Amino acid sequence: MHHPIIKPNHMQIPWHDPIRDQKELPVSQAPLPIRAGVVGRVGLLLLSCGTGAWRVRSSMNEIAEALGLVCAADIGLLSIEYTCSDGENTFAQTLTLTATGVNTAKLDQLERFVKRFPLDGVYMTADDLHLSLIHI
């Protein structure tokens, strides 16, 4: 039986593109889309490890709070729709995975990242944060 190849229905997310003009700022002082992007990326990475929605949401909220944001998220098996607000403006985004699995080693590293974030992550640049996340 012949099965057609299913092509991914998503586009790559250029996490570093919005950062170009903000390279030297700590992420806590970066514009809303950059701060919200960190929140969403951490959530998507956690979701990709196969962890539950409540755990993803809790971690996203920890990152958001450390960045001075309030975040509301709808989390499915393969996607996250979220909105972050800084009290004046909002930023909404939908992020989707093409597949999911279980990766407890990566999950452990991400949970450590989330726990350390309020202590030292808020002082890192967004570019450095995204580079850290690439290595997890």
Question: Could you tell me what each predicted segment is?
Answer:
Residues 1-122:
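Soluble N-terminal domains of membrane-associated systems
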Residues 134-136:
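Conserved small/polar residues in nucleotide/adenosyl-binding loops
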Residues 72, 131-132:
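Acidic, proline/serine/threonine- and glycine-rich low-complexity intrinsically disordered segments
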Residues 127:
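Short, conserved catalytic/metal-binding motifs centered on acidic residues
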